[in-house]
């Protein structure tokens, strides 16, 4: 999931994949704007066929938090 997410992140901000760490913060470290972040969430929904709750997504600050949230959604999808 981390690799898949870093691939998507690189489509939205100019950064090298190697510089994206689990503890990287979307806004502060990776330079995301709110619009970039919401656009990326839409792409994640399409690629992973999941539905992201915007209220829950607002609490996601780091790449690792996003990975954990997406893994949770993937698990729920399989149930």
Predicted regions and their residues:
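C-terminal structural segments of small proteins and small subunits
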Residues: 49-79
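Thiotemplate assembly-line natural product biosynthesis machinery
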Residues: 1-17, 76-79
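Phosphate-binding glycine-rich loops and adjacent basic patches that engage nucleotide phosphates
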Residues: 1-7, 26-33
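Phosphopantetheine carrier-protein modules
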Residues: 12-31, 48-59
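Two-component histidine kinase catalytic core, primarily the HATPase_c
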Residues: 36
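An amphipathic alpha-helix signature
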Residues: 2-6, 10, 41, 63-67, ...
């Amino acid at each position: 999931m981390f690799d898949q997410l870093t691939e998507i992140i690189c489509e939205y901000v100019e950064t090298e994949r190697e510089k994206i760490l689990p503890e990287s913060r979307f806004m502060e470290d990776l330079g995301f704007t709110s619009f970039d972040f919401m656009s990326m969430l839409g792409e994640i929904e399409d690629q992973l066929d999941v539905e992201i709750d915007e209220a829950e997504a607002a609490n996601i600050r780091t790449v690792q938090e996003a990975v954990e949230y997406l893994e949770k959604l993937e698990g729920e999808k399989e149930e």
